[in-house]
Amino acid sequence: MHLLVPFASDASEACRHVLRDLALPNLARVLALLSPADRDEGEPSSFTPPHERALAAAWHWQGGDGRWPWAARAAANDTIAVGDRAWALVTPAHWQLGRDHVLMTDPAHLSLTDTESSALFEAVRGLFESEGFKAAFGSASRWYIARDDLEGLRTASLDRVIGRGVDSWLGNEASAIGRLVRRLQSEVQLVLHTHPINEERE
């Protein structure tokens, strides 16, 4: 039996500080019954957290940090025919603006209904399709886009970005697809900012 414990450790100073005084007796009892196999601390700046890297290795995925097919897998689970195209996850989320940073809050806090999210998705679908993307609605919190050149785009796991500044996770601006995605991201923000559903929720 293998047990994978997501978020059980982090190389960051903040995590080490919390773990010093954190009592987890039930987890300690379970871990005492097991022998550690591999340990992957990773770097806090890697685009993929350790538990996702472990799963990617177990499934023999090719790619590397920030380039594993998580979006295609999620889309397939949402009954979208993914074929052999490269997919990206588009997640409705609130970005909190600070004086010198932009923080992404947990998308779950939006509590979008499927009806609300579907209407927002339809409002921006054309932006993606006009640039050659296939766009698909998965659920209230999962929209998808597909285009062959997304395969080379390095993207961060939501688990890395939530609660943190987004700037360090928005890599690949130098590539053509990276610049296109950043431009579309800005255009989507403009459309959604003034959308009636967004205004009703404020």
Model-derived segments and spans:
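Extended, Lys/Arg-enriched charged tracts that mediate electrostatic binding to polyanionic substrates
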Residues: H109-F137, P196-R201
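Structured loops at beta-to-helix junctions and adjacent beta-edge loops in soluble globular domains
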Residues: P6, A146-D148, L158
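N-terminal basic/disordered segments at the start of proteins
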Residues: M1-V18
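Short, glycine/charge-rich beta-strand/loop segments that flank catalytic centers
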Residues: K134-R147
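Hydrophobic, well-ordered secondary-structure segments
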Residues: S117, F121, R125, R142, ...
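Loop-centered beta-sheet repeat module
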Residues: L150-R201
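Glycine-rich, often proline-containing surface loops adjacent to acidic residues and nearby aromatics
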Residues: Q96-A108, R142-Y144, I162-W169
